[in-house]
Amino acid sequence: MITVNPIDSTTFEVIVEDNSTTTHKVTVTPSHYEKLTNKRVTPEVLVERSFKFLLQRESNTSILRSFELSEISRYFPEYEKTIQEMLK
């Protein structure tokens, strides 16, 4: 289960409950949000779907505890294209 709680307009606390529970702090810059979503979904939805993307590739305990959403592409080059498809 993925729970996304806004801390402020660009920062979110994400709690992932799986075999173990992890907490993550994620920052989403307005420009990256707009690039990925064209404002079709809320930042919370983008973060939640991004965690679904990550969990298909690694365990929640392997996900960085604090990161900017744009960093995902450094580890998974297919992220931007895939997340845009997931948000259609």
Placement of each model-derived feature along the sequence:
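Beta-strand/loop nucleic-acid-binding surfaces
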Residues: K25-S31
